[in-house]
UniProtKB/Swiss-Prot annotation:
Residues 202-213 have a biased composition (Basic residues). Residues 223-234 have a biased composition (Basic and acidic residues). InterPro entries: OFCC1. Pfam families: OFCC1. Transmembrane segments: none annotated. This is Orofacial cleft 1 candidate gene 1 protein homolog. The lineage of its organism: Eukaryota, Metazoa, Chordata, Craniata, Vertebrata. Residues 1-21, 201-234 are annotated as: Disordered.
Length: 234
């Protein structure tokens, strides 16, 4: 019986201790919630405050980081604001229009159906003029050709190139003024080989005529008599 009483007493004491400790903890938590967490830096009883004080260098560094972050965020905001929002904000309205964006109907320049044809004719005419210039440069720089090379140089350079140009064009209609231009130019072109042959034949005729004039008639008659006597001896 005594043992049981002693055990009941011990259990009561332990229960009372546990309840007191729980009450103490609850009161402490309520105080911390109402008064706030105590900052050791402002505690007067604590003598060592150096552990809780931040140095000036750390404060300056912290301020620098804050300033750089703020500047970076501001820069990002400006870039996002400056980015185009669709086609209407892609370019400033005060900028000059590009060539491909100019509408001729808005500017009062009506495009007729004949303009592309005229443009192609101008291109062909420019190509022909360029070929003729090249041919004239070759004629000026080339040495006169002899009679043996006549077959290679009879065809002018410009006509071979115009033929290639006609092949490139294919089935496209060649304007009439280009054909007329070729006919007129063909009459004025001097063939390389024919020009050299005419010079050689003219020079040969002049030389033979000059020799005939300079020959002595007495010498010719004596030469004929000698040839006749030689034939009689045979």
């Amino acid at each position: 019986m005594e043992k049981e009483k002693f055990q009941q007493k011990a259990l009561k004491q332990t229960k009372q201790k546990k309840s007191k400790s729980a009450e103490f903890l609850m009161v402490k938590e309520e105080r911390a919630a109402t008064e706030g967490i105590e900052n050791p830096a402002f505690n007067i009883s604590s003598t060592d405050l150096s552990a809780y004080q931040t140095s000036e260098e750390e404060v300056i560094r912290h301020d620098k980081l804050h300033s750089t972050l703020a500047a970076h965020q501001q820069k990002l905001r400006l870039q996002a604001h400056a980015e185009p929002r669709g086609n209407e904000y892609s370019r400033n309205y005060f900028d000059l229009l590009m060539d491909e964006e100019i509408n001729p109907r808005q500017c009062g320049m009506e495009v007729s159906e004949e303009d592309p044809v005229k443009f192609q004719e101008q291109i062909l005419y420019g190509k022909l003029m360029k070929l003729l210039d090249e041919a004239s440069k070759i004629i000026d720089s080339q040495v006169p050709v002899t009679g043996e090379d006549f077959s290679d140089s009879v065809m002018p350079v410009s006509f071979s190139k115009t033929r290639d140009l006609h092949r490139e064009l294919g089935d496209e209609a060649i304007p009439s003024y280009i054909e007329q231009f070729e006919r007129e130019v063909q009459n004025d072109i001097i063939m390389f080989g024919s020009f050299s042959l005419e010079q050689d034949s003219k020079h040969h005729k002049e030389a033979s005529h000059h020799n005939k004039k300079n020959c002595n008639p007495g010498f010719m008659s004596s030469f004929k008599d000698r040839e006749a006597s030689r034939w009689q001896q045979r």
